[in-house]
């Protein structure tokens, strides 16, 4: 472009007309030649200025082109990065279980039983700004969705989740370290999931807050379209126990939770190497019999979760009440069978654990623990429920194994019922082996 402009300028200069007096009067040759030289000098100066301006324009154009190329590269990189973040990751686990118990003569005579536990699938990821989390569990005797929700991070601190999501209550996310959870789990007060919407404020300025509204339980409430209301992962109220009902019977009077509000507040303290969360939780909702409102229910808890070096101490005090006229015992359902709990009771749990990193071949971590739980002051006048679990969990690559020795009274899965009246302490030695992918 620069050479073309130079040729055009020189051509223009060459086409300048000589003064008419130059040809007519030879005597004026000297003065006319001087004038022409002056004009040529001015023209050269103009050409030089134009060339300088042209060079500047070319440099500006080159810089603009480079900036546009850089911007395109950045945008392409952002698109690749966003595309890499999008998508759903599939994981899961396969678990087997060995148990040796004091309450089954057949089990003792066989030297214990080794059974298939579960196969589960987990979905986790995002598409655009929408998060997705789900887990479905396949047992020999049932299939259950543990959780399934979509989420959105609508501010730096706040996230909303909608679907089957965890009820914010007590020490989070678990109030236990062992395979059997704590006594609260069998009351529906630990690792419980219902269908609704949850707002989570992440830890900031030393405090966090969870607020939730659950329309009903994860199976659709009292009239959900399911084969059995006991086919679920977490314990929920499924009925009222009437006179003549057995502890493990299908409930003669079905009930379902609905319109439940739940909140959990945690404040985090740090004192040297000691880190503690102090919290309070509460929930309140209604019970429906399929035709009309049958009553109300509520629960609250004080809890703490402390870490000091490799030690972890969890404490929790809880109370709950199901307020239905003339009813002192409720039916609950989970894991394909029904059980009973008192309509009102108090619970206390104490959990201590020690985590030990190791390098023993594939074994990378051990956690030793003792978890103790007690349910007392029961409205149905049944005896206390007690469970103590002493054990160790072992992490080795994709394998995670629990070794638990359980001693319990009136405890589900340990030879009793949460509304039982036994004075015997039962024992269960349990090994749960899981491969996680």
Q: What kind of region is each of these model predictions?
A:
Residues 1-22:
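Gram-negative bacterial Sec-dependent N-terminal signal peptides
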Residues 22-95, 437:
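N-terminal periplasmic/intermembrane-space "pro-region" immediately following the signal or transit peptide
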Residues 79-221, 225, 266-272, 349-351, ...:
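Outer membrane beta-barrel
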Residues 89-93, 131-133, 159-161, 208-210, ...:
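Residue-level detector of the transmembrane beta-barrel scaffold of outer-membrane proteins
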Residues 95-99, 137-139, 165-167, 214-216, ...:
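Outer-membrane beta-barrel pore domains and translocons
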Residues 105-109, 135-136, 180-185, 247-251, ...:
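Extracellular loop and loop/strand-boundary signature of outer-membrane beta-barrel proteins
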Residues 142, 153-160, 190-350, 354-358, ...:
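Signature for the C-terminal beta-barrel architecture of outer-membrane proteins
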Residues 350, 423-437:
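Outer-membrane beta-barrel "beta-signal"
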């Amino acid at each position: 472009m620069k050479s073309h402009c130079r040729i055009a300028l020189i051509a223009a200069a060459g086409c300048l007309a000589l003064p008419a007096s130059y040809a007519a009067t030879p005597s004026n040759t000297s003065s006319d030649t001087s004038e022409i030289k002056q004009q040529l000098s001015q023209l050269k100066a103009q050409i030089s200025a134009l060339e300088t301006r042209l060079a500047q324009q070319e440099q500006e154009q080159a810089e603009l082109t480079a900036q546009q190329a850089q911007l395109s590269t950045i945008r392409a990189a952002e698109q690749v990065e966003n595309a890499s973040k999008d998508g759903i990751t599939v994981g899961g686990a396969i678990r087997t279980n060995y148990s040796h118990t004091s309450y089954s003569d057949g089990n003792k005579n066989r030297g214990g039983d080794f059974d298939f536990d579960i196969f589960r699938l987990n979905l986790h990821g995002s598409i655009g700004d929408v998060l997705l989390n789900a887990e479905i569990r396949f047992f020999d005797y049932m299939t259950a969705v543990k959780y399934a929700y979509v989420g959105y991070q609508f501010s730096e601190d706040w996230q909303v989740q909608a679907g089957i999501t965890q009820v914010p209550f007590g020490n989070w996310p678990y109030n236990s370290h062992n395979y059997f959870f704590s006594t609260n789990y069998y009351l529906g007060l630990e690792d419980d999931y219902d269908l609704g919407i949850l707002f989570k404020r992440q830890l900031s300025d030393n405090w966090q807050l969870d607020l939730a509204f659950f329309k009903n339980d994860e199976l659709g409430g009292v009239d959900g379209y399911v084969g059995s209301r006991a086919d679920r992962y977490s314990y929920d109220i499924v009925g009222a126990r009437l006179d003549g009902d057995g502890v493990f019977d299908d409930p003669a009077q079905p009930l379902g939770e609905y319109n439940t509000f739940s909140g959990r507040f945690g404040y985090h303290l740090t004192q040297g190497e000691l880190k503690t969360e102090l919290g309070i939780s509460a929930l309140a909702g209604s019970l429906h019999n399929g035709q009309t409102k049958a009553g109300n229910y509520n629960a609250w808890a004080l809890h703490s979760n402390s870490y000091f070096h490799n030690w972890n101490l969890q404490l929790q005090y809880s109370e709950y009440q199901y307020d239905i006229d003339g009813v002192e015992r409720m039916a609950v359902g989970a894991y394909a069978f029904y059980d009973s709990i008192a309509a009102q009771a108090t619970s206390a749990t104490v959990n201590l654990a020690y985590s030990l990193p190791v390098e023993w071949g594939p074994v990378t971590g051990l956690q030793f623990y003792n978890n103790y739980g007690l349910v007392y002051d029961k409205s149905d006048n049944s005896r206390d429920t007690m469970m103590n679990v002493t054990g160790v969990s072992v992490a080795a690559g994709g394998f995670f194994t629990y070794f638990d020795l359980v001693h319990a009274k009136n405890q589900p899965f340990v030879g009793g019922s949460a509304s039982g009246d036994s004075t015997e302490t039962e024992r269960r030695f349990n090994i749960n082996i899981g491969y996680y992918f």
